[in-house]
């Protein structure tokens, strides 16, 4: 296999060199693009605060595949297993409900100490951490409102939760030497026709301003805000709409989060990246796969995933775009879900790096759209798979579908023993 891989690699280098692409440079650039894996795929967004509680906020994890992580130790072990099968740099994205404490902790009282184990684990595994306040699955979010709540005391609770979360995020960045991107998403909205659409947005605006009022070192912490079209139970009105957060991120110069599943099914976030970059300093991407709605299916190597990666690479947005994943499928092996989705994101980035973009730009500028289309299509047939397999080998990760054997062995030895 190694001989075949090396032969394919040498031939691929020649093929790409013929169109002006240095594959070694492409692999070096790929190592500059970490993908932030989301912890919540491992336990269906249960968390450790109240793991038997129901998931709320208009989101759903469907399926009942056996072996989900039941505590932090199991979740970290599962993550390590997945990460061993994914080449290149990675980060981990945590939600506040994944804190660890011997006694119950109110969400407005979370502290860095409740995430110390995650930081030590991240250090040991050379990972950066990202963070999210958890404004769902809680008695004070049960009526569908959090940061835009009309009740001052409830709204203040969620403001304090987000402020506490920012301090946790800054702790991550300080300890790990890489800024933590903290994304604020809230489920606030209404099921049916809404008469007053303005007041909740006014309250959300003021609440967010209070949340980000404490100045934190941008070398440690980055604020991001995330819109959504609708959620289950909030079909008619979402307070934090695209227009609201685009305006907020632009006026406050925070990062803007674009989630692939949070728009109308005919919209794609790949087309929004270049527009948003004109107005906001940084973007956070939640790469997902919506099937008819924000279903959070496992990411495929499909046209939209490729288009997202191509936008990042074509416009040299390496230092301004943070790539995160957001899906949770409980109907398949959860470790396999991580591996499939993350490897697909990295494959898309590699394919983008292997594109003869300079030549394509020249053709476009010259108005030769025939040649542009022809070259775009022909480059799809170039042997990028051989380059990917070499990348996997250099990072001591399985080539092709060999990783599935490792997942099956782990499932038999570990996952099958869980209740």
Curated annotation (Swiss-Prot):
Assigned keywords, A-Z: Cytoplasm, Isomerase, Manganese, Metal-binding, Rhamnose metabolism
InterPro entries tied to this protein: L-rhamnose_isomerase, Rhamnose_isomerase, Xyl_isomerase-like_sf
Subcellular location: Cytoplasm
Cofactor(s) this protein requires: Mn(2+)
GO biological process, one term: rhamnose catabolic process
Assigned GO CC terms: cytoplasm
Cofactor binding note from Swiss-Prot or TrEMBL: Binds 1 Mn(2+) ion per subunit.
Residue runs in coiled coils: none
Biochemical pathway: Carbohydrate degradation; L-rhamnose degradation; glycerone phosphate from L-rhamnose: step 1/3
Keyword Transferase found: no
Binding site for Mn(2+): 262, 294, 296
Recorded superkingdom: Bacteria
Enzyme class label: isomerase
A molecular-function term among this protein's GO annotations: L-rhamnose isomerase activity
Signal peptide: none
Reactions performed catalytically: L-rhamnopyranose = L-rhamnulose
Subunit structure, as described in the record: Homotetramer.
Primary role: Catalyzes the interconversion of L-rhamnose and L-rhamnulose.
Similarity remark: Belongs to the rhamnose isomerase family.
PANTHER family: L-RHAMNOSE ISOMERASE (PTHR30268:SF0)
Name the UniProt record assigns to this protein: L-rhamnose isomerase
């Amino acid at each position: 296999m190694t001989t075949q891989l090396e032969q394919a690699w040498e031939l691929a280098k020649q093929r790409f060199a013929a169109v002006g692409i240095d594959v070694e440079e492409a692999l070096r650039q790929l190592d500059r693009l970490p993908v932030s894996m989301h912890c919540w795929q491992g336990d269906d967004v249960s968390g450790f605060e109240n793991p038997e509680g129901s998931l709320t906020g208009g989101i759903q994890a469907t399926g009942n595949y056996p072996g989900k992580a039941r505590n932090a130790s199991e979740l970290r072990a599962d993550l390590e297993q997945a990460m061993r099968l994914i080449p290149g740099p990675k980060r981990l994205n945590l939600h506040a409900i994944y804190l660890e404490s011997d006694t119950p902790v109110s969400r407005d009282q979370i502290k860095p100490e409740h995430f110390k184990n995650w930081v030590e684990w991240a250090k040991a595994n050379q990972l950066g951490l990202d963070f999210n306040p958890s404004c769902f699955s809680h008695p004070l979010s049960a009526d569908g409102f959090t940061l835009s709540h009309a009740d001052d005391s409830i709204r203040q609770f969620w403001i304090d939760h987000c402020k506490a979360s920012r301090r946790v995020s800054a702790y991550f960045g300080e300890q790990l030497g890489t800024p933590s991107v903290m994304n604020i998403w809230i489920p606030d909205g209404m099921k049916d026709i809404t008469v007053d659409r303005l007041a909740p947005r006014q309250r959300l605006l003021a609440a967010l301003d209070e949340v980000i009022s404490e100045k934190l070192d941008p070398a440690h912490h980055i604020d991001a805000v995330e819109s959504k079209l609708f959620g289950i139970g909030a079909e008619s009105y979402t307070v934090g709409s695209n227009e609201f957060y685009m305006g907020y991120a632009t006026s406050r110069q925070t990062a803007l989060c674009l989630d692939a599943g949070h728009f109308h099914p005919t919209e794609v976030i790949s087309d929004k990246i270049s527009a948003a970059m004109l107005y906001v300093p940084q973007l956070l991407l939640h790469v997902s796969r919506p099937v008819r709605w924000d279903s959070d299916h496992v990411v495929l190597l499909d046209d939209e995933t490729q288009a997202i990666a191509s936008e990042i690479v074509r416009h040299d947005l390496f230092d301004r775009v943070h790539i995160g994943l957001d899906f949770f499928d409980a109907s398949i092996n959860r470790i396999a879900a991580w591996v499939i989705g993350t490897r697909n994101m990295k494959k898309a980035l590699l394919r983008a790096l292997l594109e003869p973009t300079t030549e394509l730009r020249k053709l476009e500028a010259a108005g030769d759209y025939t040649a542009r289309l022809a070259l775009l299509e022909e480059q799809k047939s170039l042997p990028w798979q051989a380059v990917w397999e070499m990348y996997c080998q250099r990072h001591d990760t399985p080539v092709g579908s060999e990783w599935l054997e490792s997942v099956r062995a782990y499932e038999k030895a570990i996952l099958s023993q869980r209740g």
